[in-house]
Amino acid sequence: EVSRKHGVSMSVFLTAAMICAIHEEQSKMQEKKPVILMVPVNLRKIFPSDSMLNFFSYIEPGYHFGEGKDSFDDVLEATKQYFEENLSKEKIAERMNNLIAYEKHKILKWAPLELKNRCIKMGAKLAEREVTAVLSNMSVVKMPPEYAKYIERFGVYTSTMRTELCVCSFG
């Protein structure tokens, strides 16, 4: 209801709220860098797939505080704009095509798998350095009605090294 009042999705609202919450806890030294979240994106909603394998990507919305406009509404508007620009089918397809181009590169195609795996790990670590935390909105969880009365909460276990907040809706 609160997110609707602001004219944004729950994911946009929660992302902006988490960015602001992290900023409130930052030291003066940390404030020099932007707060950047890694937000997983379920690609099945954009590219229908029958595969049971994980089919996701991620976006990295963020905000650089200290440039004058630091209210929640400012962060919310910037986050909304980021989601609109980066969650289009075209933008995600472009990103996926760039990753596929690396995979099909003539020289990289012939590189030993062990070398490729090391390079991928290094690249992931470099990209991850800028990320402050991870926010996973698992969306609505549906359970059979006969089980619903017994459910008080859901637990989620993740394997990220960063601070991660996982949220879901139920009921």
Kindly give the residue locations of the regions a language model identified.
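Acyl-thioester-dependent acyl-group transfer interface
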Residues: 23-171
